[in-house]
């Protein structure tokens, strides 16, 4: 009699290539695969892994956040590297001179960086300039910044839960009666 082995945990779920069929992304993957293999650099390994990621795991990053991170001591003159999109922040009046490398830069952010005397480079240019990631600062946007993330966590209503409930409307009759008002049963 044979033993039925559980193969439930055999497969390690991780991406080995991007889901997207974008030819330019595939070329970048080819380039960083080569660099990861030939240079013993952790930087290239991280870039390659992030190129495989879904759009949700490559959140956009605002100029203001990049500026804040680049203002730290010892980071002057370095290249800010973002495997994702750089977006503009209209709350910031002036931006300093920056050298950034990203997959995408929105039109407004692009014009502001260039107007400040900065430079925007692509990942293939970065590979020539810093094949091992020397003089670069690798950053990423906040992954839990999406509205959907507010609904994740312990059920809304349980003690110490800050999870947002899926409510049809914010009116008086919607989750604002029993347990919320003394006139309706009790108030917690």
From Swiss-Prot:
UniProt GO molecular function: RNA binding; structural constituent of ribosome
Record bears the keyword NADP: no
Location of the protein in the cell: Cytoplasm
Keyword Cytoplasm on entry: yes
Gene Ontology cellular component annotations, sorted alphabetically: cytosolic large ribosomal subunit
Any one GO BP annotation for this protein: translation
Keyword field: Cytoplasm, Ribonucleoprotein, Ribosomal protein
UniProt feature, compositional bias: Basic residues: 161-171, 178-188
Family: Belongs to the eukaryotic ribosomal protein eL18 family.
Protein name in UniProt: Large ribosomal subunit protein eL18
Phylogenetic classification of the source organism: Eukaryota, Metazoa, Ecdysozoa, Arthropoda, Hexapoda
Gene: RpL18
């Amino acid at each position: 009699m044979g033993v039925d082995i559980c193969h439930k945990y055999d497969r390690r779920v991780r991406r080995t290539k991007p889901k997207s069929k974008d030819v330019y992304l595939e070329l970048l993957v080819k380039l960083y695969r080569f660099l990861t293999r030939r240079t013993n650099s952790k930087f290239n390994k991280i870039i390659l892994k992030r190129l495989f990621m879904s759009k949700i795991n490559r959140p956009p990053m605002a100029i203001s956040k990049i500026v804040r991170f680049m203002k730290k001591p010892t980071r002057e003159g370095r290249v800010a590297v973002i495997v994702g999109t750089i977006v503009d922040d209209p709350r910031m009046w002036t931006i300093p001179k920056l050298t950034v490398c990203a997959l995408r830069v929105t039109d407004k952010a692009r014009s502001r960086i260039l107007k400040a005397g900065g430079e925007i480079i692509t990942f293939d240019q970065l590979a020539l300039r810093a094949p091992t990631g020397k003089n670069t600062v690798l950053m990423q946007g906040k992954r839990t910044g999406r509205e959907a993330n507010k609904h994740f966590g312990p059920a809304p209503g349980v003690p110490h839960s800050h999870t947002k409930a899926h409510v049809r409307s914010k009116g008086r009759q919607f989750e604002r009666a029993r347990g919320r008002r003394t006139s309706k049963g009790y108030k917690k």
